[in-house]
Amino acid sequence: VVPHVVTSAHGDRQDEYYWLRDDDAKAKRPEIMAYLRAENAYADAMLAHTGALQDTLVREMRARIKEDDSSVPVYDNGFWYSTRFDLGAEYPVHLRQRGSVEGPDAAAPLEVMLDEPALAKDKPFYDLGGWAVSPDNQWLAWTEDTVGRRINTLRIKNLVTGEVLPTEIPGVLERIVWAADSATLFYIRQDPQTLQSGPVYRHVRGTAPAQDVLVYDEPDKTLFTTVGRTASREYIAIWLTGFTTTELRVVPAQAPQQAPRVALARRADVRSYADHLAGRWIIRTNDDARNFRLMQATDAALADPARWTELVAYRQDATLEDFALFNQALVLQERVEANAQLRVLPWNGQGGFTVQADETAFVMSLGANLDPALPRARYGYDSMVTPHTVYDVDLATGARSVRKTQPVLGYDRSLYDSARLWAPSRDGKRIPVSIMWRKDAFKRDGTAPLYLLGYGAYGYAYDPYLNANALSLLDRGFAFAIAHVRGGSELGEGWYDDGKLEHKQNTFNDFVDATRYLKAERWAGKVFASGGSAGGLLMGAIANQAGMEYAGISLWVPFVDVVTTMLDETIPLTANEWTQWGDPREKAAYERMIAYSPYDNIERKPYPPMLVHSGLWDSQVQYFEPAKYVARLRARKTDANPLLMHMDLESGHGGKSGRFERLRDKAREFAFFLDLAGIAN
């Protein structure tokens, strides 16, 4: 304990564990490393009796993975692209094969573009950020992170000769895009301190990075900058995106030297997203349409919203989440009553249809539809009991074809069941809850253990999916559920708005209310809660506000020191997220945030058993947030329940990068919960 005062215009706070913070991106002070290693050793000792169970769980989870697996090929500009996992490999190989929109050319060789296992060799962490192939199909640019801090390096490869150019550009974001000349590459440099988006640059292949030209530098650091291309391939798109506003600037792909022009100007509280094809812009906007509507405009009219015409009207009962443009049709992704579904609208106005679903609770999501000449749209389908399935739907007939159902080895769907429940909230709302169980192992008698996930932030819809790892819990009598709490967008933009800023407490109340409903309706006797990042904030809040409702809580890379972080603009994400949580420089926002910030509300009272997971190189939620949280909680709580922290010293926000390596962390959590539930195997 070292006294330290965190100052603000609205009051000072003691932070006796502030000494655990070290902003050095390459190494931490010896006393901090000693502390973190001691925490890891303590957690290992406390869980040593579950070692055999953890090993069993890892074997079970790995046995469900088809080790020699391939993705469904995706078409773009004369090639079909895919990934392949070889037996035992942690990382995939990226492949391509020549072909047409009808399919790959069987006579053409399968080319290796990127060999991730080779790139990751001898590295404790490897993450392929993004990649882009030049329009002439000869050059590959990609970004990679070898630390886990989401600091990427840009590299370029000649796909004809296999030569990797010596040029490397460090400190860039993942997204990159080529101009039409196949020589000019647009990328975004990271702010060296916050690691967030900085200025857009263009690089000419074969020249030194020092000669790269500044294209655009956004002064408003609450906006996030990304680059892309339009479906027509006529424009390089520079997007400036915040939680409440957007702006689009474009550069002609044929004239990359031109300065970007404003195509969609930012407007307060208006979010618009546009794409271009066949001489017109299609715009998804919430202007006068809370759940979004679709507009269209010519090139000349795009900058003036008064000249737009409506293409798809606003619906109060449906949220327009996304769209994809094809030469012959427009495909919409809409959400109705928590289900995401697709609707196809031919440009000729004839034969529109909604894509068929086979279950009552499901999610469809637009896939990688990269070439508008395709006669079929690619989409994914998921539910609590259905493995991820890739479909193509014929844009003319509506006929669906299954391209691949993700193998879950040993999974027998007939043994499991699922339901969509609606839990009443304390303020009269209906909270969707997706639940799954094994029919011959689970008993709905009010005694069963239940594994409950939640998130509730950023408008992210935590959709139902088959959690293959959780089958190890279900086979031992657990139920598995997701509480779709406010702050997500499962029930539209209003559901999102009612779980942020001054309404953030609704997120926590919803999770607790869903928990109590599941107990009252005899779905659960003991509830074990888990959430990560902003979902870790949710876990920290419920631990303070209703902790003893839970038999155990697991927090993954948790955002728990809300006010201190949001006061510090040097920390990644802070300025970008003031419109999400509030700006604590303002008194009203400060008081709201301090009222729920988990670190600031730890009390001298009993807490449930808790397990905290973090990564030393996490740039999204810095390692010292969970480290301080655990230290203060251990000092103040009055019970003898276990409080454990595992700090991965070689990873960041996403945990281990290898597909098998990360199973060990999940096995630790499951063994912790199974042990608390009294289930040894």
Regions found by a protein language model. Name each.
Residues L128, P170-I176, D191-L195, D220-F224, ...:
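Alpha-helix capping and helix-loop boundary segments enriched in small/acidic/polar residues
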Residues I482-N681:
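Active-site-proximal cap/loop segments of hydrolase catalytic domains
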Residues D275-H276, D288, A324-F326, V336-E337, ...:
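A structural signal for short secondary-structure junctions
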Residues E102-D105, V147-R149, L159-E163, A179-S182, ...:
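Secondary-structure transition/capping motifs at alpha-helix termini
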Residues V112, L214, A479, P642-L644:
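Conserved beta-strand segments of alpha/beta enzyme cores
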